[in-house]
Structure formats: structure tokens, C-alpha cells
């Protein structure tokens, strides 16, 4: 660690003098670590990079832990301040009307090779909590764990692995934060009926053939299934927390039944029925109002906010393909069906030919053609929002 500031200062000075990076490194070893062989020099540089990487992780955890202290979460520009401003101006009804046709769509697109692997993300989360609690013993242990944990995988991740890494953000960041935003809006807006579609999450990994040519149909289906399973796990955890508070006779048993239903679906022992799940939660809400003076209804409403946001799909898989590949596929299909290329829109819409599923023998073409059909398969399990953009 003591050589890092020395190396940093040395590099800055030599770069200012016009030396090349290769010259700078060679001169540094001559002046400060003379006598080391090439392998020892490589080991030293590797440890420098390793040390700096972990410093960056520590800074990330520190920033997360101190965010609420460094930023006024209720100040100017925040959602709560905006809603107060709307209320004071008497514009809540107008805002409600505008939100009927307004939605934002955050799309997770970046390849997770740019992010930390899941085990490092878990350490950052625990380290952040320990810093917030000022638990020095835990901080020290997590830093030791971080020092022994590789930050990058030695083997290239599969498209499914990449999707799993990004799903971590859905599960641990977006599920909570998007739900909190919706709950804040619900508490502030008049005549809220739970149907506003304020936030729609998009998801490219597993469906993006343009960005990752190794994506195939089985990957798309796997990712869609994983999105649904992880979402059900989030619902299950929320239900367990609900049951700790809502311990009243009758309603407690209702929550137990819902929890068992979700758990069976997670284990693939029972088919997921969103309508049944949604209705059961509303029954719990109604019983709390009618039989228990509305105690803890806010907790149920917060879960219903998330159910309205994420449904059965969590995020919509965007099926993407290079337009040239799509043209190749349709040219091959037209040739297979014996259809001439339409010259006018009228001729195009008048076509009655239908693909019977016969494959061409070209993997890319067949995958492109079958990707249109897989959308319906995903929609049948994850509702239409599960995959509705090509």
C-alpha cells in the first residue's frame, strides 16, 4: 500500500515530462524496486491494481452509506418537495390527470461485465450497512472478505450469467425504490386507484441479440422465468414481513395462505395465478378496514403498489435484433413460402401466407423467426407486459 502514492506521484511527474507509460514503469522499477525479476514486477503491478480496485469498492460503500447525509432527500428537487409544491399551488388534480398518460421507462441495458459480480455486490451492501451502523468490527471483517474475493470472473459469463447479474439490481434496488416512489405518489395524490403506470422497467439481457449474438431462444425463456421467480421471491419476503405485524385472527390465516401459494409457485409446484394473488391481497386489505380498524393497512397498500408496478413480469424483456438479420430472416421465409416481395403497403397487408414453423437450417435465421413466437410464450406466463417490444 505504501508504494501506491509513490507510484502515483512518480507517474504524474514523468507524464508531465513527456515520458511514455512503458518508460515510466521501467524507470520506477529501476529506482524503487531494483533487482526484481519480471515475474516479481508483474506480481507487484497486479497487487497495485488489486489494491486500487478494493479502494474503489470501499469508496462506493462509503458514498452509499453517507448519501442521505450528503444530500437532502426532502429538499429542493426531491419528490416530496415537488408534491408539497403541487399541493400548495392547488395543482394535484391537474397533476393526477397528466399522470394518466405519463410514464418513465428505465431500461437495464449495460452489459454486467462493467459491474461487480454478485458476491462483491453483496459485500458492498453489507459493508454499507456496517458503515451506517458504525460497526467497526463488521467493517474490518468485510474488508478482509473483500481482499480475498475476486472482483472479476476468469471465464467469460454466458448471456444468462449476465442477466442474473443485472437482475440483482432489480431485486435489491429497483424493487424497493420504485415501490417507495409509487407509495409517495399514492399518499399525495387524490382519487388514487392503483392503476397509474408510472414506472415501467425494461430489460435487455437475454433478449438483446443485437448487443450479444450468443443470445438464443432458450436464454430468453430462461431469463423471463428467472425474472418471474425473483419477483415472486420479493413478494414472498414482503408477505413474511407483513405477517409479523398483521397477527390478527382471520387475516393472519389469509396471509399464511397467500404466502404458501407464492412459495409453491417459486418451487414450481403450482401454476402462478396473478389474479388470484391480487384478489387475495385486496381481501386482506378489506378485512383490515372492516374488522381491525385499518391497523397496518399502509403495509398492505405498499405491497399492492409493488404488485401494480411489477405484476408477474418484474421487467419487460426487449427482444432486439440487427435489422439486417431480420431482413435475412424474412427473405428466407418469403423464399420458403414462395411469396414475392410486396411492392406496396396494400400488397403487404393483403398477404395471407403463414409460417408453419419449418426451419431453414441457418441458426441465426431460425432463431430470428422463432423469436417472434417466443414473445407469445413469455406473455402467457409473465402477462403481455413480459415481452411486448421488438
Language model features by range: what are they?
Residues 1-349, 360-367, 386-389:
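Often metal-dependent polyanion-binding catalytic scaffolds in large enzymes
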Residues 356-357:
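Core AdoMet radical
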Residues 368-375:
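Well-ordered, non-membrane alpha-helical segments in soluble/globular domains
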Residues 375-383:
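Acidic (Asp/Glu)-rich catalytic clusters
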